[in-house]
Amino acid sequence: MPPPPHIKPENVLKRAQELIAVGQAPAALTVLHEHATSKRTRSSPIASLEPVMLLFVELCVDLRKGKAAKDGLYQYKNIAQNSNVGTIEIVLKKFIELAEKKVTEAQAKADEIQSSLESAAPSSNVEDLEAIETPETILLATVSGEQSRDRTDRAVVTPWLKFLWETYRTVLEILKNNARLEIMYQTTALQAFQFCLKYTRKTEFRRLCELLRNHVQNAAKYSAQMHAINLSDPDTLQRHLDTRFQQLNVAVELELWQEAFRSIEDIHTLLSLSKRPAKNVMMANYYEKLARIFLVSENYLFHAAAWSRYYNLLRQSAVTLSTNQGSKKDHPSVTEADMTKAASFVLLSALAIPVISTSRSRGALIDVDEVRKNKNTRLTNLLGMLQSPTRAVLFRDALNKGLLKRVRPEIRELYNILEVDFHPLSICKKVTPILKKIGDDPEMEKYVVPLQQVILTRLFQQLSQVYESVELKFVYELAQFPDPFQITPSMIEKFIMNGCKKGDLAIRVDHISGVLTFDTDVFSSAKALHSGSAAGSAESELGSVQRLQNTPAEIARLQLTRLAKTLHVTCMYVDPSYNDSRLQAKQAALTRAAAGAAKEHEDTLERRVIIEKKKEAATDALQRKQKEEETRKRIRTQQLQEAEKQRLAEEQRERELKRIKDEQDRIRQQELKKQLEELKSGVKGIDLNEIDLEDLDANRLRAIKLAQLEKEKNELTERVRATGKRIDHLERAFRREELKHIAEDYEAQKKVDMEIYERQKAQTLAEAEAKHKEAVALKHRLSRLIPVFSSFRKEVSEKRHEEFEKRRKAAEREFEAKKKQRVKEVQERRRREKIERENAERAKREEEERIKREEEERAARDAERRRILAEEKAKREEERAKMDEIAAKQRQREEEAEARLRAKRAGLSEPPRTESEVRTAPRLNIAPRTSGGPSWRERQAAKEAAGGAAPEAPKAEPEPPRRTGGYVPPHARGGSDAAPPAGNRYVPPSQRSSQPPSRTQTPPTSSPKPEEPKPLASGTGGKWVPRWKQQQQNQ
C-alpha cells in the first residue's frame, strides 16, 4: 500500500503554504517539523527536501523557535551530508541571514520608537516652565519609568539578539567535527565573532570561545568517526589558526584579556601541531597582541620580550622582502617608520621593566615559587624562547642588533640617562622633558608609571651606597617629576615600604626627625633577586646598577674572599716553588688530558654507535609493536564494526517489518474510521455505537452504506413526488392572479424608461456642447504657435537631415574601409590557405615518396639479404659436399687400414712369405658373415671359374699416416662408421659383429695382387651404402 499523500515533501510544502495563507503559521511549522524529523524523510530526494527546509527555517525564525530549528537541521544534516553538502550550506546560510535580518529590523524599529519618543517629548504641554520637575513627576518616573533607550532595546532588540546568538551556536553545533562542512564551520565562527564585536556581547564571546575550544578537543577524541576532521592536515590546521587569530583580535577589541590569553594558548597549541611554519604576518599579529596582553597584566618583563620578538620578526620580513624571497601577502608590510616605532617600543618597554621584584616576598613558600616558575616557563614557551628573559638579556640583545640607531632621540637619551650615566642628584631634571614627550604620545603614556618606579629604585640604590641617612625633604626634592606625573610623598613612602617588604631595600623612615636611614647592619644577608620572578631582575648576570662604593654589609660579607685572594698572591711571591709546582701540576694534567682525549673520543664514538643501535632497535621494536597493535586494533575495530553493522541491520530489518505492519494496521484503522465518519456525516439514520471496529471490514461497511443509501433514496423519491404535486397547484394559482396586473405594470415600466432616456439624452448633449467649446478655445489658443512650431520643426528637420547625411557618409566610408579590409583579409586568408594547402600537398607528396623510397629500399635490402642467404646456402652446400667427399675418402682409407690390420692378424698362422711376394694392397681380416650368403672371396672365385678373368686390381694408394689416438675429427666423425684400429678406438655395440672373428679361420692364399676389399655388408655393422654405389664399386 503506498504511503499517505502528505508524506511526500511536495505535498507537505503545499499544505504548509496553505496554512500560512490562512494565517496559521504555528500549524504550518508543526507540519514541517514533523516531516523534517520523521524517519520516512530519509528516503526522500534532497532536491524536493530543500524547499521544505528553507520554508521550515523561515517559519522558525519568524516564530523564534530555535529548538525546533535545531532538531530539524540536525536531521537534515544527517540525511544530506553523504550526498549533497551544498544544500546544507544553503539552508544554514538562509537560517543565519534571516536571523540577522530580524535583528536589523528590530534595531530599526527601536530607533523609530526612540525617535518618536524624543520628538513627542518637547511638544508636551507643561503648566509651569519653572517647576517642570514636580514631586509628582519624580515619583511617577521612579515608579513607572520612561521609555528610555535601554528599556526599548531590552524589549525590542534583545530577544532577537538572543535568538541570533542561539542561531550561531546551533549552526556551529551542527557543523562541528565534519570535514565536508569545515569551511562553512569556520565562516560561521567568524560571523559569530563579528556579532559579538558589533553588539559588544562579552558573555556570549566567552561562551563562544569555550564552545570552539571544546570542539577542537573533541575532534581529536572522535577522530575515528565518519567525516571527522584531521588536525594533521595542513589546510585544516591553517583554517583553525585563522579562526583563532580572529578570536584573538576580537578578544583584544573587547578588552577581554583573560580570554585573549587563552586564545594565545590555543594558537600556540595549534602551532605546535602544525608541520609547516606559520606566516610572518600571522606571527606579527600574534606577538603584537601578546605584548598588549602582558602590558595590561603589568607583566613588563614578558611585555618587553614580546616587543623584542615582534621587532625581530619585522627585521626578518624586511630582509626577506628586500631579497624577493617571499610573497608580500605572507609578510607584514614594513616601512622605516614602522621599524623606528617598533625599536622605540622595544627599548622603552625594556627600560620600564621594574628593577625591584614585584612578585616575591621574603617569606615566599616553595610551592608558590614552583607555581610561579611553571608559569614563567609557560609564558616563555608562548614567546618561543629557549629560556626565560631577563632585563639584562633584553638590553644586550637590543644593543647587539643596533637598536640605538633606530630608536627615537628621546628614547635613546632616556636609555643613556638610566643605564649608562645615572646620577641620582640630577636624574629628575634630566628625565622631566623626556617624560613630557613620552606622556604626549598616547601609546607611550602607559610606560611613564613603570619608568618612575625604575627611577626611584635606581635613586634609592645609589643613595644607599653613599649615605647612611638622608632627610626626607631632600629625597622629595630629588624625586620631582613633571606635573601630570607628579609623585606625592605618600607614594614615595609606599614605594619604600613595598621594597622593604619584598626584601630589596633596607630603609627606615623616621617621621619625627624627618630622616631616611639606610640599613647598615654588616651581618645582613645578600638580597639576591629571584631568577624566575615575573618582573625579572636588573641585577642578574651583569649587575646593571652602577657601583659607586661597597657598603659596610658588602665589605663584611666579602672579607673572607678578599683574605683568600691576598693570601694566594702572597704565597706566589714568597714561595716560588709553590707556583712552579702549580704550573707542573697543570702541565701534567694537560698531558694526561691530551693522552686520554683520543681514547675517550673513541670510547665516546663507540658508545654513540652502541646507543644509536640500541635506539634503532628500540625504535624498530616500538614500531613493530605499534604496527602489531594497530593491526590488532584495526582487526578488532573491523570485527566490532561488522558485528555492529550486522546488529544494526537486524534491528533495522526488524524495525522495518514492525513499521510496515504498524503502518498497515494504522492505515486500515484510518480507512475504517474515515469510512465510519463518512457514514455518520453523509448517511443519516445509522446507529454505529453498538458496532465493534475490530469486527468491521470494508465489505461489511460497504453493505451497510449501500443499504442505508437505498433507503434514503426511496424516502427522497417519495418526498420529491409529494412536494412536486403541491408546488404545481401553487404555481397555477400564482399565474392566474398575475394575469390581472400585467398591463398596468407594463405601462408604468414604459413611463419610467422614457424619463430615464430623456434625462440621459439631455446630459449627453450638455457634455458634448461643453467639450466642443473647450476644444474650440484650445484651437484658437494653439493656432498662434503654428508658425513658430513650423519654423522650429523645419530647422530641426534640416539639422537632423544634415546630421543624417554626415552619419550616412561616414557610415559609407567606414563600410568601404571595412569592405576593403574584409576583401584584403579574405584574399590574405585564401592566399594563406593556398600556401598551406600546397605545403600540405607537398608534405603529403614527400611523405608518399619517402614511404615509396623506404619500401624500395626495404625490398632491395630483402633481395640482397635473400641473395646473401642463397650464396651462403650454396657455399654451405659446396662445403658440405667437399666434406662428404673428404669423409668418404677418409672412410675408404680407414677401411683399407682395417682390412690390412685384419689380414695381418689372420696371416700369423700362415707359413712365412717369400721375399718375391710383394703386397700391393692391404689385406683385411674381415669377420665372418653372420648371414648364410657367400663371402666376397667365394664370389670372386666363382667369377673366375665362370671363365672371366678378374680385372686388374687398382694401384694401391699410399697409406695415410695412421692415427694412434682415439680422437676423430668432426667431419670424419659423422661420415665414417669404420672401426678404429684395434686397441686404439672404441667400437659401439651397435657396430660390432654378432660373433667375434674366428682365429682358426684359414686365410686365403696369398696372391701378388690381392683384391681391394669391398664395403662391408649391412649385417656386419658397417655403414649403409646405396645400391647404385655398390654397383659402381663392383664394376
From Swiss-Prot:
Query: Per the record, which residues fall in region Disordered?
Result: 619-649, 809-1035
Q: Which InterPro entries does the record associate with it?
A: EIF3A, eIF3a_PCI_TPR-like, PCI_dom
Q: Which UniProt keywords apply?
A: Coiled coil, Cytoplasm, Initiation factor, Protein biosynthesis, RNA-binding
Q: Give one Pfam family.
A: PCI
Q: Does the keyword Oxidoreductase apply?
A: no
The region annotated as signal peptide is none
Q: Can you give the residue ranges of the PCI domain?
A: 339-523
Quote a single Gene Ontology cellular component term: multi-eIF complex
> Where can this protein be found?
Cytoplasm
The protein's GO terms of the molecular function aspect are: mRNA binding; translation initiation factor activity
- Biased composition, class Low complexity, residue ranges: 943-953, 988-1004
Coiled-coil residues: 92-121, 606-910
The biased composition feature labelled Basic and acidic residues covers: 619-632, 809-901
Instruction: Please provide the Gene Ontology terms (biological process) for this protein.
Output: formation of cytoplasmic translation initiation complex; translation reinitiation
Q: How does it assemble?
A: Component of the eukaryotic translation initiation factor 3 (eIF-3) complex.
- Functional summary from the UniProt entry: RNA-binding component of the eukaryotic translation initiation factor 3 (eIF-3) complex, which is involved in protein synthesis of a specialized repertoire of mRNAs and, together with other initiation factors, stimulates binding of mRNA and methionyl-tRNAi to the 40S ribosome. The eIF-3 complex specifically targets and initiates translation of a subset of mRNAs involved in cell proliferation.
Question: What HAMAP family does the record point to?
Answer: eIF3a (MF_03000)
Instruction: Spell out the family assignment given in the record's similarity comment.
Output: Belongs to the eIF-3 subunit A family.
Name listed for the protein in its UniProt record: Eukaryotic translation initiation factor 3 subunit A
